Design a protein with these regions (language model features):
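Glycine-rich phosphate/pyrophosphate-binding beta-alpha loops
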Residues: 11-14, 30-37, 71, 117-121, ...
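Metal-dependent enolase-superfamily TIM-barrel catalytic cores that perform enediolate-based chemistry
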Residues: 111-112, 116-228
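Structured beta-strand/loop patches that form or line metal/cofactor-binding pockets in enzymes
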Residues: 1-28, 32, 318-325
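Shared catalytic-loop signature of beta/alpha-barrel
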Residues: 45, 61, 199, 205, ...
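C-terminal extensions of enzymes
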Residues: 317, 321-367
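Conserved, mostly hydrophobic/aromatic
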Residues: 3, 24, 47, 85, ...
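Hydrophobic faces of well-ordered beta-strands that scaffold small-molecule active sites
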Residues: 29, 114-117, 143-147, 181-185, ...
Length: 367
């Protein structure tokens, strides 16, 4: 059945996509968060025009063809927009078949382990970070926690002098020896400094060092990964499949972290997961907010063979992400350190009509 209309509902931060087929079947997806209003313009200009009138179930063909048709415009915005089409069509496919996307991919909806992911760095002291981790452990059953070290794109600087050396032992002492600790460097270090920080992390039993070097410096990151025994991880920023192949072939990191929305949707992320599986590498995607990206990631991780042990689950509320409240129902909630993969058809969630009523609207349709 052919795609008849493609609609977007957006604000600056979030953009939902509704795809409707000629028989009235619908599916909901989402472009990547942040500057979503710009991404929705790209969607209508450079994505929708190629999708209208094509087979709504030909997801893999569409997401492979559109970047070729727009080959003069490679890069992040096109992939962020493409995700809106891909994910809307996966939702439609699931609803047609009466299955969740997880089931379409060969998995089974179930509670999936998550790690408590802090987005704060300069806004919080080491003591306060450790205290909220303890509270979340006791309330939600988390056994794994991620926090920030260094300074974002920091050229070896710390967010403030001594912060990294303080927060790592502080969190370890607070949570005890059995908690799994993960840290994110956010492109902060040169290899020499990253290795030195990594040695300190190893001394405190940290198991995951994310994006230690500028993400575009693959050889720098590989140098760090080769030098350390803990897992060096990365890949969230990468939206080019050729770069993914390059990073996997050179084993730039120990754990691959694609972001479903940045990369262009489920079909492209599945390709990365297959390449990683063939290389013996696990996948632990980037899903750093509670928009639909975490829903997409839960479904994916419930199905792929090389899924890592956890899905990233943001612990930030309205003080940090005021825009993520009330987007869809049911809301994602962590209990016993797990979040259920939504079990209904498609993504298993409903977009909030009150949110849609306030959003900027645009429609592309068959002539």
């Amino acid at each position: 059945m052919k795609i008849k209309t493609l609609e977007t509902f957006c604000n600056q931060y979030v953009g939902f996509v509704r795809a409707t087929a000629e028989d009235g079947a619908t599916g909901w997806g989402q472009v990547s968060p942040y500057n979503a209003d710009i991404t929705c313009q790209v969607f209508h200009r450079q994505v929708a025009r190629y999708a209208l009138g094509t087979d709504a179930d030909a997801i893999e063909t569409l997401v492979a063809t559109i970047p070729e048709r727009e080959h003069k415009f490679p890069g992040s915005y096109l992939m962020r927009a493409l995700c809106g089409l891909d994910t809307a069509l996966w939702d439609m496919r699931g609803k047609r078949k009466g299955k969740s996307v997880c089931e379409l991919l060969g998995g089974k909806p179930r509670p999936f382990p998550v790690y408590a992911s802090s987005m704060k760095r300069g806004e919080i002291t080491p003591e306060a970070e450790a205290a909220r981790f303890i509270k979340l452990r006791d309330q939600c059953g988390y056994t794994a926690f991620k926090f920030r070290v260094g300074k974002e794109c920091g050229h070896d600087e710390d967010e403030w002098p001594g912060r990294t050396d303080a927060i790592v032992p502080q969190v370890r002492k607070a949570l005890g020896p059995t908690a799994r600790l993960l840290v994110d460097g956010n492109s902060g270090y040169t290899p020499k400094k990253a290795i030195a920080v990594g040695r300190m992390l190893e001394d405190h039993g940290v198991c995951h060092f994310e994006e230690p070097c500028p993400y575009w410096e693959y050889r720098w990151t590989k140098e760090v990964a080769d030098a350390l025994s803990l897992d060096v991880t990365g890949g969230e920023q990468d939206c080019d499949l050729a770069l993914w192949r390059f990073a996997i072939d050179m084993r730039a990191v120990d754990v691959m972290q694609p972001d479903v929305c940045y990369l262009g949707g489920i079909a492209r992320t599945l390709q990365v997961a297959r390449w990683a599986k063939d290389a013996g590498l696990p996948i632990t995607p980037h899903s750093a907010n509670l928009s639909l990206v975490t829903v997409f990631t839960l479904h994916l991780m419930g199905a792929i063979e090389n899924a890592g042990p956890y899905v990233e689950f943001s612990i930030e509320g309205d003080d940090y992400y005021p825009w993520q409240d009330g987007l869809f129902t049911p809301a994602l909630v962590a209990m016993d350190g797990k979040v259920p993969i939504p079990a209904g058809p498609g993504w298993g969630v409903e977009i909030n009509p009150d949110w849609l009523a306030k959003a900027a609207y645009q429609k592309s349709e068959l002539a």
